[in-house]
Each structure stands twice: as structure tokens, then as C-alpha cells.
């Protein structure tokens, strides 16, 4: 439901499962309703977790956007990467969400490649 809501439903489920299995880190935010559990936010990372990691597939269901959930996902991911000792993280994003990552302190690639960089202190 989340992938459909954010327009990513074109990915075959089998391939998505394989990507998740091979990810370094997976984070999900669930709506707590025992009648209808719903994944409302998600993000994942790939990489070695020491020198580099790449953040992928950050998504928040449109009904829950604007409530700080995207920031919570990114804060959790960066805290986990710091804990692992990761030196650098990169991400790739659609142009419409680049201001979100700028507000979180990511350095955006100046040549318009839709990617950003984060460096550990």
C-alpha cells in the first residue's frame, strides 16, 4: 500500500523482497491500529556500514506527510550509521524532495544529479 501511494508500485514484489534482504538497514514506521496495521513510512540503506552507505527508498504515505515522519526516518538512519562507524552516506532522490534533504543538512550535488552527501564528524 505504501509503495502504491507514493507511486512506486511498478517494482515487482519478488525483486523488492530481494533488495530488502540484501539491505544493510531497513526502517519502517507503522500506524498502530490493531484492526488495520499500515506501513506509513519506510527507508533502507545499502553499503558496507563502515566506509560508505547509500540511503534508498525513503517514503512516507501521503496521508502522513508533514508530520515529521520523514525526519524521524532519516534521524534514525543517520544515528544507526554513526553507531556503525560509517564515514559517509549518499542518497538519490526525486527533484521534488531535494529541499527536504537540504533542510536536514545534506550537501546536494551541484551538477543536478539528484544526490546528496552526509559526512560523519
Where are these regions (language model features)?
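Short amphipathic alpha-helix that is part of the acyltransferase structural core
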Residues: 1-14, 32-36, 112
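A conserved beta-strand-loop-helix scaffold within acyl/acetyltransferase catalytic domains
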Residues: 14-59
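Conserved acetyl-CoA pyrophosphate-binding loop and the N-cap/start of the following alpha-helix
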Residues: 64, 68-76
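Conserved short alpha-helix immediately C-terminal to the canonical SAM/SAH-binding motif I
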Residues: 73, 97-100
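Conserved GNAT acetyl-CoA-binding A-motif
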Residues: 74, 79-94
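Conserved catalytic-core motifs of GNAT/GCN5-like acyltransferases
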Residues: 90-92, 102, 107-121
Amino acid at each position: 500500500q505504501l509503495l502504491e501511494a507514493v507511486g512506486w508500485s511498478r517494482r515487482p514484489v519478488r525483486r523488492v523482497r530481494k533488495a530488502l534482504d540484501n539491505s544493510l538497514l531497513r526502517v519502517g514506521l507503522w500506524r498502530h491500529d490493531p484492526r488495520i496495521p499500515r506501513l506509513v513510512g519506510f527507508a533502507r540503506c545499502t553499503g558496507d556500514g563502515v566506509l560508505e552507505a547509500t540511503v534508498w527508498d525513503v517514503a512516507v504515505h501521503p496521508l502522513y506527510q508533514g508530520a515529521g515522519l520523514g525526519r524521524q526516518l532519516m534521524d534514525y538512519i543517520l544515528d544507526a550509521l554513526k553507531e556503525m562507524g560509517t564515514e559517509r552516506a549518499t542518497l538519490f532522490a526525486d527533484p521534488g524532495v531535494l529541499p527536504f534533504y537540504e533542510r536536514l543538512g545534506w550537501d546536494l550535488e551541484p551538477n543536478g544529479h539528484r544526490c546528496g552527501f552526509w559526512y560523519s564528524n
